[in-house]
A protein has these predicted regions:
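Amphipathic alpha-helical assembly/interaction segments
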Residues: 1-107
Length: 107
């Protein structure tokens, strides 16, 4: 798994989902926060493989925390009716896989 590219793809999917949420009549009030966390995840994992091992672990944990934050906002959007399970499923699956890869490599 190329964590840098996967994190970038995750950030893009989060941005697309936020755009969708903003286009709906009932706008999800935490969409901006979800977008910020998605971008943080992508930026923290950028060029991860080029870093020294200690820095790599620290940045991987930072990126994993941002992924967790996105998944939390995503769950809030689903439970409050702004998204369906189906609408959230792709980003949720991507986030879970990315989080696992980041945490495994950070340990």
């Amino acid at each position: 798994m190329d964590r840098s590219n996967d994190a970038f793809d995750f950030a893009i999917r989060v941005a697309e989902l936020v755009r969708y949420l903003r286009e709906k009549p009932d706008r999800f009030p935490l969409a901006a926060e979800m977008l910020a966390a998605g971008v943080r995840a992508g930026m923290a994992a950028r060029d991860l493989e080029d870093l020294a091992e200690t820095a790599q672990a620290s940045r991987a944990r930072e990126a994993a925390a941002a992924v967790d934050e996105v998944l939390y906002y995503l769950e809030m959007a689903v439970r409050s009716g702004y998204l369906t399970e189906l609408e959230a499923s792709h980003v949720r699956t991507m986030g879970a896989a990315l989080h696992a890869a980041l945490i495994d490599d950070a340990e």
